[in-house]
Amino acid sequence: LRQVHLWNLGFIKDKTKGKYKEIEDKISDALAFMEACGINSDNNRRLRSVNFYTSHEALLLPFEESMTRIDSTTGEYHDTSAHFVWIGDRTRQPDGAHVEFCRGIKNPIGLKCGPTMKPEELVRLCNILNSENEAGRLTLISRFGADNVQKYLPKLMQAIKKEGLKVIWSCDPMHGNTIKAATGFKTRPFESVLKEVKNFFAVSQAEKSYAGGLHIEMTGQDVTECTGGAQKISEDDLSNRYRTHCDPR
């Protein structure tokens, strides 16, 4: 944070840099005030360390199983490959191996919900994966595509609410908006990503449900993998810095 003024702002248009400069100054002022009060990283451990959590899809079951350990004090199973693992939209069969594995571990888990998810199937999966209806145990990650959110999400939220199931609702605006550009690259229009996020929040508000998070694929690299955005990246620009080996970030 002390180096915030040196962060790369090349992606920001000139007319918006003033807003970020103001935020930078406020951060620097806050740190200076804390220093003046005698609070610094030398005498406060919280200022020199962070809680860092990892997450990934529990797709390769031989790997996940090899990383699973038993807590000798409780007898519970924990998947040590990540703090939070999720089940993909294509591997969420109620009687499938991925669901069976995830229901047996104590990690918080996620479940991707796409356009083919039926309300009754979702309720069944919730009862399997979170049989004790424990708050914080199960996160439902919607991924419909920008134009399908209002068609599918309300019914799922209504079914969960009717059954009194305790879940966290999250939004994945990436996977439902993947397209193939004319140039052959797999990409995602930023405008579609943003639209799905806005529609997710709108439906959550209408259904009186709490919007609990976003699932976004990002990278610290300077890439040109999604079109649009602040730089208005075109399909022709994708080849400039297309680095991903899988999905566009």
Language-model features: where?
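Active-site-facing alpha/beta catalytic cores
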Residues: 1-145, 185-188, 195-197, 210-217, ...
